[in-house]
């Protein structure tokens, strides 16, 4: 009896006719997309990458350049990961034109810079990992992403000041926002290397 009473409460009393909703076979549905070139959506073709290293790389690349290897921003930063020319020189790349035309070189450069930053910030990673600073849980991947944005020195200042020294790039993106957005990824397999080169 109770089941019958409850199930009758979910049945429509009157069915409505929605003929306006149906599409005639002769009608054409048009959709407008931002771009017709599939190459504009390279980063979106990846499968689910989760919190693995590939997810870290692709998420950071998408934030930096929408994942485009040929991107040069208004400040002259280059490639998928938006490297400055000086930073490229520190990891052994002298020819920026070759760098821009070689996706494999850009990927190797990203890993080399991670190794170098991990070595530079190895003490901070040990000391601050797991702590909450300026409302952000500090993780190794967050520290490395923030170092990619503003350099190891800016990350060190932020951490040592307990978040009081707010560092931002020229576009206004903060170190702490990168720490938050890119925290919790698997970067522990990247070895720290003071002399990392491509």
Segment roles from a protein language model:
Residues 6-68, 104-108, 118-135, 193-197:
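Export/targeting segments at the very N-terminus of extracytoplasmic proteins
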Residues 58, 62, 85, 145-150:
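Generic alpha-helical structural context detector
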Residues 1-2:
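Sec-dependent N-terminal signal peptides
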Residues 46-54, 73-81, 99-107, 137-141, ...:
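Solvent-exposed, acidic/flexible segments
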């Amino acid at each position: 009896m109770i089941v019958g009473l409850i199930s009758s409460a979910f049945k429509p009393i009157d069915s409505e006719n929605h003929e306006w909703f149906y599409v005639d076979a002769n009608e054409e549905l048009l959709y407008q997309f931002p771009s017709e070139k599939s190459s504009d959506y390279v980063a979106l073709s990846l499968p689910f990458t989760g919190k693995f290293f590939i997810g870290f790389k692709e998420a950071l690349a998408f934030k930096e350049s929408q994942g485009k290897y040929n991107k040069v921003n208004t400040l002259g930063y280059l490639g998928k990961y938006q490297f400055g020319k000086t930073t490229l020189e520190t990891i052994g790349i002298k020819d920026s034109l070759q760098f821009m035309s070689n996706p494999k070189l850009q990927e190797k450069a990203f890993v080399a810079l991670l190794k170098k930053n991990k070595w530079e910030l190895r003490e901070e990673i040990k000391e601050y990992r797991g702590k909450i600073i300026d409302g952000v849980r500090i993780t190794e991947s967050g520290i490395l992403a923030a170092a990619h944005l503003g350099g190891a020195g800016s990350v060190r200042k932020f951490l040592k000041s307990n978040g009081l020294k707010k560092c931002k790039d020229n576009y206004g993106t903060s170190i702490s926002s990168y720490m938050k957005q890119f925290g919790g990824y698997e970067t522990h397999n990247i070895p720290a290397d003071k002399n990392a080169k491509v």
